[in-house]
């Protein structure tokens, strides 16, 4: 049975009829059937895989791992996220139906870990890409800590009002080597800036106005010449 308390759901009449609200009923059904999408890239994922065994038995929480983001409402990121993998992670998150949740598992996912000290290709925190609901520190976290994070997420869902959830702004993201992310307008317009065909010696010399400035379309013949 679910041990999470609902203020309205606990009131019953003499005939054992439960009086509740649609919002509490929706929260109860969602927290009892979380379907996670496992996004594991490092050793933290091995710790999460041990939860599937009989020792921890995470099926008692209603967790059913899914391989498709369209069938999942929880994504669990475990391991290092590189700049090259960032667009794929954002695409998976945007394909998940609302409401959706994120658990960041491990130091590499939360802050970049030891790989972020001298690596230009490591994302220093997955929350720069997608909104995170629960942070789970550790290197790697134990399976008991993962269960505790899932319990905290279930408590958060129990107190949730769906209309108050802040839906993240959808748009194309631009990120640079200094790990600054920006929402920009669509770049898939077929228009290209000729000034970017011959980049300077340092990418830091390109201003933001120049990078997102659009001119008339350039034909393939002009590009060759």
From Swiss-Prot:
GO cellular component: chloroplast thylakoid membrane; respiratory chain complex I
Record field: catalytic activity: a plastoquinone + NADH + (n+1) H(+)(in) = a plastoquinol + NAD(+) + n H(+)(out); a plastoquinone + NADPH + (n+1) H(+)(in) = a plastoquinol + NADP(+) + n H(+)(out)
Matches recorded under InterPro entries: NADH_UbQ_OxRdtase-like_20kDa (IPR006137), NADH_UQ_OxRdtase_20Kd_su (IPR006138)
Positions of [4Fe-4S] cluster binding: 43-44, 108, 139
Source organism superkingdom: Eukaryota
Keywords of the record: 4Fe-4S, Chloroplast, Iron, Iron-sulfur, Membrane, Metal-binding, NAD, NADP, Plastid, Plastoquinone, Quinone, Thylakoid, Translocase, Transport
BP GO terms, sorted: aerobic respiration; electron transport coupled proton transport; photosynthesis, light reaction
Enzyme class: translocase
Compartment(s) where it occurs, according to its Swiss-Prot or TrEMBL record: Plastid, Chloroplast thylakoid membrane
Cofactors named for this entry: [4Fe-4S] cluster
Molecular function in Gene Ontology: 4 iron, 4 sulfur cluster binding; iron ion binding; NADH dehydrogenase (ubiquinone) activity; quinone binding
Membrane-protein topology: Peripheral membrane protein
EC id: 7.1.1.-
Main localization (coarse): plastid
Note on how the cofactor is bound: Binds 1 [4Fe-4S] cluster.
Function: NDH shuttles electrons from NAD(P)H:plastoquinone, via FMN and iron-sulfur (Fe-S) centers, to quinones in the photosynthetic chain and possibly in a chloroplast respiratory chain. The immediate electron acceptor for the enzyme in this species is believed to be plastoquinone. Couples the redox reaction to proton translocation, and thus conserves the redox energy in a proton gradient.
Record PANTHER family: NADH DEHYDROGENASE, NADH DEHYDROGENASE [UBIQUINONE] IRON-SULFUR PROTEIN 7, MITOCHONDRIAL
Subunit structure, as described in the record: NDH is composed of at least 16 different subunits, 5 of which are encoded in the nucleus.
NCBIfam families: nuoB_fam, PRK06411.1
Family in the record: Belongs to the complex I 20 kDa subunit family.
Protein name listed in UniProt: NAD(P)H-quinone oxidoreductase subunit K, chloroplastic
Organism: Lobularia maritima
């Amino acid at each position: 049975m679910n041990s999470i308390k609902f203020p309205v759901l606990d009131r019953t009449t003499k005939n054992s009829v439960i009086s509740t609200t649609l919002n509490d009923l929706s929260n109860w059904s969602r927290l009892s059937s979380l379907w996670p999408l496992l996004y594991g890239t490092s050793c933290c994922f091995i710790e999460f895989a041990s939860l599937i065994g009989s020792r921890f038995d995470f099926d008692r929480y209603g967790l059913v791992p899914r391989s498709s983001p369209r069938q999942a409402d929880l994504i669990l990121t475990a391991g290092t996220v590189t700049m090259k993998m960032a667009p794929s992670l954002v695409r998976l998150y945007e394909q998940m139906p609302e409401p959706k949740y994120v658990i960041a598992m491990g130091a590499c996912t939360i802050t970049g870990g030891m790989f972020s000290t001298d690596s230009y290709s490591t994302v220093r925190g997955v929350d720069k890409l997608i909104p995170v609901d629960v942070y789970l520190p550790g290197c790697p976290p134990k399976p008991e800590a993962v269960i505790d994070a899932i319990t905290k997420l279930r408590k958060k869902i129990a107190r949730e009002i769906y209309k108050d959830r802040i839906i993240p702004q959808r748009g194309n993201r631009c990120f640079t080597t200094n790990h600054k992310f920006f929402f920009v307008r669509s770049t898939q317009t077929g228009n290209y800036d000729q000034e970017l065909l011959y980049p300077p010696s340092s990418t830091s010399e390109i201003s933001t106005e120049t990078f997102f400035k659009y001119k008339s379309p350039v034909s393939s013949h002009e590009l060759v010449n």
